[in-house]
Structures are given as structure tokens and as C-alpha cells.
Design a protein with these regions (language model features):
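Expand to "…catalyze enediolate/carbanion chemistry for C-C bond making/breaking, isomerization
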Residues: 1-304
Length: 304
């Protein structure tokens, strides 16, 4: 139970749990990962009804190989514990992960971890339900290293720059953009989250970009976070899916080159050589490690 499953997270598609129509469309999309939302996308008066719709959607829709996730309300609300209990009791066998919101400390994650442990025993579930945590408050970012290492159940951290803007007092008219800042206003926060995730062996994921009518700006944000080490990004609209899939997938020519270099190095290593020249490029153990972590492992995970 300590082994974390490897899941594609190039695109995490946000889907309101109150809409059967949108859940149907999400199940038919090309997204790697769909999270059915019980938090911001659902009005307080509709949250209990949305749980029922989510349970039905998880059980009846064909999700293919997608990661099926439910985003719950934060632990300061009266909804969070019932979100977990009702969804897991109703559709635990059809659920891969639960996304926690406004995570501040490791104790927040451990609360959900213990509750899920009890539910899994009660329901005799055959596999563990994973956790994903949104880091979207200053306190959460200050504690991000400890949060990332809080439990083996935790699979990824997501940078939620919308609420983080409010927490920091950052002027951000368009969530996910830099709004005139001379550079990337999110560079430090993203970099810090990625480092915490890599040290803990979990996935770093970038959050939303609100202006879904601007695919070029969305692509730029995807590329920025990908270069920093993020494995994927939220899509708040289906039109963003293809952009993110392309941005976070290794290019076919890069895969071919990486496999060529890996093969050449393996052959050289068998002959006792430590570094070789391939097409004018020095290849050694360090460069092979980079290729595996940035190209080859991703290609294997995505079936490329």
C-alpha cells in the first residue's frame, strides 16, 4: 500500500459536479484526469444534490482510462467530511483520487488519510483511494515541504493561483496570468511547489488559466510550468485540453533521439566506457538520467 500509482496528469479537467451534461462530456473528452467539483463550481444550496449526481456519474459513465477524481470542499466548511464519506460510500470502487482544497498543514491531509483508511476497511475496497492537495494559501505554501511528505496516500500537489492571489494580495484580474508584471509572477511559487513534490516523489501540477478564449496565452503558461517541472495543468474549458496535452507530452522527435542516445550509451557502458560522443553531443550517466526523467519515462507513461 506504500507504492504510489503512476497516473497521467497532463490535463486535469475541471467539471461541475452539479451538471450531468458536463460530466457526460468530460467522460468523453481526451483529458487524462477529470475532477468532479463539489467546491467553487457548486452553489451551497446544490452541494448535497451534487454529491448524488457525482456518485451516479462515477458509477454509470464510461471514463475509460481517465483518473476519476472528486474535488471536495475545504476542511473549514461543514461539507468536507460528508463529501468524503458520501462519495466513497456511494462510489468508492469507481473513484481514483480525492482532491483537497485550501490545504494549510500536514494535519489537513492526515485527517482525510485517516478517514479514507477507515472507509476503505469498512467497505473492503481492494485498492487505495489517492489524495491530491491544492496549495492555494500563503500558509499552505509556507508548509509545502511538510505537506508533500505527509502521507504515502498523497499523489500530487496543485498550485491554485486564484485563491493564492487573494491570500498574497496580488492584483490578478485574469487568474493564471501575470497581468502586466515584468516577468512570471508565479515563478517562485511554482518552483517551490515543484521542488517539494520532487523531494517527496509526487507529481506537481499547475492550476487554472481563466481566459480560455486565449489559447496562445494558455500555451505559454503551460510551457512555463512544464519547463519548471510540472507534469500538467488544469483545463477549465474543453478547448484547453489539446493545448495542454501537446505542451506536457514529449515530442516524437525528442523521444526518438532520447531512445537512440540511451541505446548508444547502454552499448558503450557494456564496453566499459563512461561517456561517449553521439552526433557531436557528449552523453554520460547524467545526461541519460535527464532524458529518462524528462522524455523517456513520460513517453512510457503516455504510451508514446
Amino acid at each position: 500500500m506504500n507504492d504510489r500509482p503512476r497516473r497521467p496528469r497532463r490535463v486535469q479537467l475541471s467539471t461541475p459536479g452539479s451538471s450531468e451534461k458536463m460530466m457526460q462530456k468530460a467522460s468523453e473528452s481526451k483529458a487524462d484526469h477529470v475532477f468532479l467539483d463539489l467546491e467553487d463550481a457548486v452553489a451551497p444550496s446544490q452541494k448535497r444534490d451534487a454529491r448524488k449526481k457525482i456518485i451516479e456519474g462515477l458509477k454509470t459513465l464510461n471514463w475509460g482510462k481517465k483518473t476519476r477524481c472528486v474535488r471536495i470542499n475545504d476542511l473549514t466548511t461543514e461539507y468536507a467530511f460528508e463529501d468524503i464519506i458520501e462519495v466513497v460510500e456511494g462510489a468508492g470502487e469507481h473513484l481514483d483520487t480525492i482532491m483537497m482544497t485550501k490545504v494549510m498543514t500536514p494535519a489537513d491531509v492526515l485527517f482525510a488519510d485517516k478517514l479514507l483508511h477507515q472507509l476503505e476497511k469498512k467497505l473492503q475496497l481492494k485498492r487505495r483511494i489517492g489524495l491530491e492537495a491544492l496549495i492555494e494559501e500563503v500558509e499552505g505554501m509556507q508548509n509545502v515541504d511538510a505537506i508533500a511528505k505527509s502521507t504515502p496516500r498523497l499523489e500530487c500537489l496543485v498550485f491554485g493561483m486564484g485563491d493564492f492571489s487573494a491570500s498574497m494580495g496580488v492584483t490578478n484580474k485574469n487568474v493564471g496570468s501575470s497581468d502586466g508584471y515584468p516577468g512570471d509572477v508565479w515563478h517562485y511559487a511554482r518552483f517551490r511547489l515543484v521542488m517539494a513534490c520532487r523531494a517527496a516523489g509526487i507529481d506537481p501540477v499547475d492550476g487554472p488559466f481563466a481566459d480560455f478564449r486565449n489559447p496562445d496565452a494558455y500555451r505559454e503558461e503551460c510551457n512555463r510550468s512544464m519547463i519548471l517541472g510540472c507534469v500538467g495543468k488544469w483545463a477549465i474549458h474543453p478547448s484547453q485540453i489539446d493545448v495542454a496535452l501537446e505542451a506536457y507530452s514529449p515530442k516524437p522527435e525528442d523521444i526518438a533521439r532520447a531512445r537512440k542516445l540511451e541505446k548508444a550509451y547502454a552499448e558503450a557502458e557494456a564496453k566499459g566506457l563512461g561517456a561517449i560522443n553521439v552526433d557531436g553531443v557528449m552523453v554520460d550517466v547524467a545526461s541519460i538520467r535527464i532524458l529518462r526523467n524528462t522524455v523517456l519515462n513520460k513517453a512510457d507513461l503516455y504510451g508514446m
